[in-house]
Amino acid sequence: MIGRVTGILVEKQAPEILLDVQGVGYELLLPMTSFYNLPEVGQETTLFTHFVVREDAHLLFGFSHKQDRSLFRELIKTNGVGPKLALAILSAMSVNEFVYAIEQEELSKLVKIPGVGKKTAERLLVELKGKFKGLQQTDFFIKSSHLPGIKCSKLDQSLQLDEAVSALIALGYKPIEAEKMVKKVLKADLTSEQLIREALKAAL
């Protein structure tokens, strides 16, 4: 099993990245909470990983912190929650936020995540409550004010919007819904990562 990788970030298009590890290119899927922590393309980064083998594909998921990976692994143990839905959950909430939602039984917040209906949310509450006592000690939630802002031209802004919408669709949102979410928070000085972050935060 591949537990951790260190390499040069070659490409990033949320939620996917390409990492060059000693000449071998690894494609990884990241939750947005980890994607926000990535360096610029061309720089080195280290990610904790989880490898999923399916009949039709081999998927490698990457995480900035062990706690994120631990939560991902707990999520996919839950009946009805696969890797794609677990990725959507971790993209919508930080570890602390999710743990708090479970412990406080905030069903209304959980059902706002794409792919999480009432039955799935109830199942998460039943199966996961009380399991995360060691996970909520450190907050990995990065505030948008800590993310670098870049002034964008109208063309750049259109590109940022398209990238943000594509990322939300990949996370399970419907195209029309994703576009509305991004346009609702659209500002000239926000990067695509910041737009995704603000759109997900506003959706909850």
Curated annotation (Swiss-Prot):
<dbReference type="GO" id="GO:0009379">
    <property type="term" value="C:Holliday junction helicase complex"/>
</dbReference>
<comment type="similarity">
    <text>Belongs to the RuvA family.</text>
</comment>
<dbReference type="GO" id="GO:0006281">
    <property type="term" value="P:DNA repair"/>
</dbReference>
<dbReference type="Pfam" id="PF01330">
    <property type="entry name" value="RuvA_N"/>
</dbReference>
<protein>
    <recommendedName>
        <fullName>Holliday junction branch migration complex subunit RuvA</fullName>
    </recommendedName>
</protein>
<feature type="region of interest" description="Flexible linker">
    <location>
        <begin position="144"/>
        <end position="155"/>
    </location>
</feature>
<dbReference type="InterPro" id="IPR036267">
    <property type="entry name" value="RuvA_C_sf"/>
</dbReference>
<dbReference type="InterPro" id="IPR010994">
    <property type="entry name" value="RuvA_2-like"/>
</dbReference>
<comment type="function">
    <text>The RuvA-RuvB-RuvC complex processes Holliday junction (HJ) DNA during genetic recombination and DNA repair, while the RuvA-RuvB complex plays an important role in the rescue of blocked DNA replication forks via replication fork reversal (RFR). RuvA specifically binds to HJ cruciform DNA, conferring on it an open structure. The RuvB hexamer acts as an ATP-dependent pump, pulling dsDNA into and through the RuvAB complex. HJ branch migration allows RuvC to scan DNA until it finds its consensus sequence, where it cleaves and resolves the cruciform DNA.</text>
</comment>
<feature type="region of interest" description="Domain I">
    <location>
        <begin position="1"/>
        <end position="64"/>
    </location>
</feature>
<dbReference type="InterPro" id="IPR011114">
    <property type="entry name" value="RuvA_C"/>
</dbReference>
<keyword id="KW-0234">DNA repair</keyword>
<dbReference type="GO" id="GO:0005524">
    <property type="term" value="F:ATP binding"/>
</dbReference>
<dbReference type="InterPro" id="IPR003583">
    <property type="entry name" value="Hlx-hairpin-Hlx_DNA-bd_motif"/>
</dbReference>
<keyword id="KW-0238">DNA-binding</keyword>
<feature type="region of interest" description="Domain III">
    <location>
        <begin position="156"/>
        <end position="204"/>
    </location>
</feature>
<dbReference type="GO" id="GO:0006310">
    <property type="term" value="P:DNA recombination"/>
</dbReference>
<dbReference type="Pfam" id="PF14520">
    <property type="entry name" value="HHH_5"/>
</dbReference>
<keyword id="KW-0233">DNA recombination</keyword>
<keyword id="KW-0963">Cytoplasm</keyword>
<dbReference type="GO" id="GO:0005737">
    <property type="term" value="C:cytoplasm"/>
</dbReference>
<keyword id="KW-0227">DNA damage</keyword>
<dbReference type="GO" id="GO:0048476">
    <property type="term" value="C:Holliday junction resolvase complex"/>
</dbReference>
<dbReference type="InterPro" id="IPR013849">
    <property type="entry name" value="DNA_helicase_Holl-junc_RuvA_I"/>
</dbReference>
<dbReference type="InterPro" id="IPR000085">
    <property type="entry name" value="RuvA"/>
</dbReference>
<dbReference type="InterPro" id="IPR012340">
    <property type="entry name" value="NA-bd_OB-fold"/>
</dbReference>
<dbReference type="GO" id="GO:0009378">
    <property type="term" value="F:four-way junction helicase activity"/>
</dbReference>
<feature type="region of interest" description="Domain II">
    <location>
        <begin position="65"/>
        <end position="143"/>
    </location>
</feature>
<dbReference type="Pfam" id="PF07499">
    <property type="entry name" value="RuvA_C"/>
</dbReference>
<comment type="subunit">
    <text>Homotetramer. Forms an RuvA(8)-RuvB(12)-Holliday junction (HJ) complex. HJ DNA is sandwiched between 2 RuvA tetramers; dsDNA enters through RuvA and exits via RuvB. An RuvB hexamer assembles on each DNA strand where it exits the tetramer. Each RuvB hexamer is contacted by two RuvA subunits (via domain III) on 2 adjacent RuvB subunits; this complex drives branch migration. In the full resolvosome a probable DNA-RuvA(4)-RuvB(12)-RuvC(2) complex forms which resolves the HJ.</text>
</comment>
<dbReference type="GO" id="GO:0000400">
    <property type="term" value="F:four-way junction DNA binding"/>
</dbReference>
